[in-house]
Amino acid sequence: ASASPSPPRLFPLVLCSPSDSVYTVGCAAFDFQPSSIAFTWFDSNNSSVSGMDVIPKVISGPPYRAVSRIQMNQSEGKEKQPFRCRAAHPRGNVEVSVMNPGPIPTPNGIPLFVTMHPPSREDFEGPFRNASILCQTRGRRRPTEVTWYKNGSPVAAAATTATTVGPEVVAESRISVTESEWDTGATFSCVVEGEMRNTSKRMECGLEPVVQQDIAIRVITPSFVDIFISKSATLTCRVSNMVNADGLEVSWWKEKGGKLETALGKRVLQSNGLYTVDGVATVCASEWDGGDGYVCKVNHPDLLFPMEEKMRKTKASNARPPSVYVFPPPTEQLNGNQRLSVTCMAQGFNPPHLFVRWMRNGEPLPQSQSVTSAPMAENPENESYVAYSVLGVGAEEWGAGNVYTCLVGHEALPLQLAQKSVDRASGKASAVNVSLVLADSAAACY
């Protein structure tokens, strides 16, 4: 159900750390509906203030939130404060007075500087999913009073501690905040002897714009090599751009059948500070190869409606197996003691999915000893692809007459596997029994 129409709740905002040259104040509007809102600013002489901006235009909803700020020269701001922020809304207009007093004067003229330090994303990675917000003062005395507020309502904080650092007294007051409180955008305020500092995730210090991104889902098809080895197909549904993974539900379904057992992976932190989680289910390779359809269904508290994404194997209209060629090291490499290159080429195949493995005398070699290219379009007109793999071989190993075999797996090959071998003596293909190479990894699917 949609939120009921309501006017905004307005709160003053100031910088976490005062600037010596730029005067900045702001105001935050919370919980209004509908989203239409307009800010205006007035100075102490009731004159309209220009240079206002809104960050961003409107934040999420419903209900909605928005932030407005003004900036000017420090001396001009001090002269014209306090300022009034007015928010015009269809459900009523509200005002709040705000000023940035800067350093707090004391009876003996010694200033007290107040700063606020929000938690980092890493602070929430502990087992209890909580962190702390720090309000710190520096000066030649301890503050007489520190109070905390959450969205304008008083909250309890830990006792203020103080230490002496040279001529300064550094006092610290902390409040505990859960990851859920921080992620939902709650505003926390620290008031030191009448001076306020604010912080929240969505309005860091009341100034930083927040890049809003919608939750997205993407289905990832199983790889051919995994299907070949395990005889099963892994269906992956990737949910990204989540502020919090709490309440996430991911389920895989057969398009013509029931629900599949779905496992949720660990959440992964994205570069933008949001989270990604994979939902994974497994089906038989025969079902996947047969063209069965599957549906990923996602629900999350931040989604207005559940999301769905379908997936099935795309049949190649012009499927062709690769021709496999193996080449010995070039003559130029044989003249020294450098490492040699044995090359395998898979040519003319479609679809562009295959794997390459190397063996020496019938024994598998580590994949770290070779470099394999991604399939490249050889002839776009008839959907033909080519791929190369280069195996590094020691000069002594090659000279000892070892046989090197290139195994190529592709769905259009007989038994989905082809091989070609080469050695120093013949340079011709050698027969190698590869039926047992992958047998230990093979698994039946029922």
From Swiss-Prot:
This one is known as: Ig mu chain C region
Positions annotated with a glycan in the UniProt record:
45-46, 73, 130, 198, 382, 433
Residue numbers spanned by region C-terminal region: 428-446
Q: Which GO terms describe its cellular component?
A: extracellular region; immunoglobulin complex, circulating
Disulfide bonds, paired cysteine numbers = 27-85, 135-190, 237-296, 344-406
Task: Report the Gene3D superfamilies cross-referenced here.
Answer: Immunoglobulins
Q: Does the keyword Zinc-finger apply?
A: no
Q: What are the start and end residues of every segment in region (CH3)? A: 210-316
Q: Which GO terms describe its molecular function?
A: antigen binding; immunoglobulin receptor binding
Region (CH1), start-end ranges: 1-105
The record's InterPro entries line, in alphabetical order, gives: CD80_C2-set (IPR013162), Ig-like_dom (IPR007110), Ig-like_dom_sf (IPR036179), Ig-like_fold (IPR013783), Ig/MHC_CS (IPR003006), Ig_C1-set (IPR003597), Immune_Resp_Modulators (IPR050380), Immunoglobulin_dom (IPR013151)
Which residues are in coiled coils? none
Task: Give the CDD domains listed for this entry.
Answer: IgC1_CH1_IgM, IgC1_CH3_IgAGD_CH4_IgAEM
GO BP, sorted A to Z: antibacterial humoral response; complement activation, classical pathway; positive regulation of B cell proliferation
Pfam families from the entry?
C1-set, C2-set_2, ig
* Span list, region CH2: 106-209
- Keyword Disulfide bond part of the UniProt annotation: yes
CH4: where is this region? 317-427
Instruction: Supply the alphabetized keyword list.
Output: Disulfide bond, Glycoprotein, Immunoglobulin domain
